[in-house]
């Protein structure tokens, strides 16, 4: 099901000037993987994998800080297709069961 995707990049907290940029697109989430416990905002890195309406792959990476949500840091990576995304994020895509 296609819906609006909005991902952000930068640091969240007041001392880090909020988020530096964001990306909005139409698409669907095709995978998720985390190496920690991001739901509790205490540690780890989470990856959301999206496919846009145009077929592009967006990987949204969020590193959750150990102590405060003000230090959470996000980044997004946009690729033309799944093969291109796999060159940089092969392990993430495997663990998210996308490839």
Task: List the predicted regions and their residue ranges.
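Terminal, low-complexity, charged helical segments
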Residues: 3-5, 49, 57-59
């Amino acid at each position: 099901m296609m819906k609006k995707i909005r991902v952000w990049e930068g640091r969240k907290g007041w001392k880090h000037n909020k988020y530096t940029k964001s990306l909005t697109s139409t698409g669907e989430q095709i995978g998720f993987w985390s190496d920690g416990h991001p739901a509790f905002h205490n540690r780890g890195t989470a990856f959301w994998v999206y496919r846009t309406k145009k077929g592009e792959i967006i990987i949204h990476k969020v590193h959750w800080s150990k102590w405060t949500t003000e230090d959470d840091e996000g980044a997004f990576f946009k690729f033309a297709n799944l093969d291109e995304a796999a060159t940089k994020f092969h392990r993430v895509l495997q663990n998210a069961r996308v490839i």
